[in-house]
């Protein structure tokens, strides 16, 4: 990691629904409200945004809407992680093409990747997307923890912009 790409207030938004469908009108209002409140960046389709319940088509529309609404007034970070490296790479590339400023990629869940597997996963995403990526370590949700040693290796990746550490161990915040 060279220098911070994302600084200041970064809000992880919920994904509003109306019935069984994403409420894009309400999402636009939520984005606008966060921008007016001073958000420096907004995360769309992360854990708070119910990413596992969304289709890729819904995610891409959410990202497109986010970029359109923000109009450069704040950065848009797209949640593109998956339990499938190929799917995470594909969604990351598509999000990048839509003009998002960065990606939040949760560790692959369910499959309990090895540490070398995590490195390969993040390398595939960072190499393919070509924009800043934040690795998201949340072992309580994914079943796998990015080790301190692996964090050190990830920081050497050109496009890795940071690590969102949610393992519950405050002592790891210095990594």
Q: Language model features by range: what are they?
A:
Residues 2-11, 15-145, 151:
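Active-site beta->alpha loop and helix N-cap motifs at the rims of alpha/beta catalytic domains
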Residues 73, 157-158:
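Acidic-histidine catalytic/liganding microenvironments
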Residues 103, 135, 158-169:
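Catalytic beta/alpha-barrel core
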Residues 146-150, 155, 167-170:
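Active-site glycine-rich loop that binds ribose-phosphate moieties when present
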Residues 173-175:
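Conserved small/polar residues in nucleotide/adenosyl-binding loops
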């Amino acid at each position: 990691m060279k220098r911070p790409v994302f600084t200041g207030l970064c809000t992880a938004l919920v994904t509003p629904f109306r019935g069984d469908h994403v409420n894009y009108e309400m999402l636009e209002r939520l984005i606008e409200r966060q921008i007016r409140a001073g958000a420096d960046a907004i995360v769309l389709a992360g854990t708070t945004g119910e990413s596992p319940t969304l289709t890729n088509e819904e995610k891409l529309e959410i990202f497109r809407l986010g970029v359109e609404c923000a109009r450069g007034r704040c950065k848009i970070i797209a949640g593109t992680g998956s339990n499938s490296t190929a799917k995470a790479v594909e969604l990351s590339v598509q999000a990048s093409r839509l003009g998002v400023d960065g990606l939040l990629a949760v560790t692959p869940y369910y499959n309990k990747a090895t540490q070398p597997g995590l490195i390969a996963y993040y390398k595939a995403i960072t190499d393919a997307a070509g924009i800043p990526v934040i690795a998201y370590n949340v072992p309580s949700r994914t079943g796998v923890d990015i080790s301190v040693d692996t964090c050190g290796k990830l920081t050497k990746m050109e496009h890795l912009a940071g690590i969102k550490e949610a393992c519950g161990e405050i002592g790891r915040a210095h990594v």
